[in-house]
């Protein structure tokens, strides 16, 4: 088993067998040749969907978080939007922190509310308030800890204990996997923006 520092440098990358570069190459190609119709080489077709550089990043983040897999998007807000769209549908309910990142808060209030998703805003530093906010149709509890920009700290493990049937999603942007491992504390999904500490 390797340590965090070694994983931070090497996790997720295997040198290709043709040239064996030590560092992860940056693939600048937007498209990849196919051997025939729908016969992708290495599973890559178009960089917007993925390429070997992005795959190495995804594998590294998954390894650092102790996750089975990771998916990289063009921005942290894109990752948040996708996570919520996968987990929520009209008629569902989300519990969100009263000091969540403004972009996340606006996405929930302005987009998901119009989509028919209800929300309850609570103080995530109070697990009892979180427990009281969970409803029969609650599908997501959104935790950001430390929060951006107020640096509020939520007890992920205590919230996991009261989440009931809801998915616990943790925005781990400020702490990074070096300081906090949400999956080990009961999170179901972890998101990051790589504009901070990753």
Where are the regions that the model predicts?
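N-terminal glycine-rich, Lys/His-bearing helix-loop that initiates the first secondary-structure elements
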Residues: 1-43
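Short, hydrophobic/aliphatic alpha-helical segments
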Residues: 4-8, 59-63, 186-188, 192
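Conserved PLP-enzyme active-site core in the AAT-like
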Residues: 10, 69-198
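Active-site C-terminal subdomain of aminotransferase-like
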Residues: 18, 38-40, 49-50, 189-198
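Short, basic and Ser/Thr-rich N-terminal targeting/leader segments
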Residues: 21-22, 66, 115
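Conserved N-terminal alpha-helix of the aminotransferase class I/II PLP-enzyme fold
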Residues: 31-81, 103-110
């Amino acid at each position: 088993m390797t340590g965090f520092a070694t994983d931070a440098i090497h996790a997720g990358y295997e040198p290709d067998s043709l040239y064996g570069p030590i560092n992860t190459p940056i693939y600048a190609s937007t498209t990849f040749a196919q051997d025939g119709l729908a016969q992708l080489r290495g599973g890559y077709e178009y960089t917007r969907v993925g390429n070997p550089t992005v795959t190495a990043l995804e594998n590294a983040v998954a390894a650092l978080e102790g996750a089975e897999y990771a998916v990289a998007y063009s921005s942290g807000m894109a990752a948040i939007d996708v996570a919520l769209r996968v987990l929520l549908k009209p008629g569902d309910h989300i519990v969100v922190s009263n000091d969540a990142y403004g972009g996340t808060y606006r996405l929930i209030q302005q987009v998901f509310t119009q989509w028919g998703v209800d929300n309850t805003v609570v103080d995530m530093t109070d697990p009892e308030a979180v427990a009281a906010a969970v409803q029969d149709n609650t599908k997501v509890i959104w935790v950001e800890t430390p929060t951006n920009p107020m640096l509020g700290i939520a007890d992920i493990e205590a919230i996991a204990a009261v989440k009931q049937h809801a998915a616990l999603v943790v925005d781990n942007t400020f702490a990074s996997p070096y300081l906090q491992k949400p999956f080990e504390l009961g999170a179901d999904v972890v998101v990051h923006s790589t504009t901070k500490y990753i």
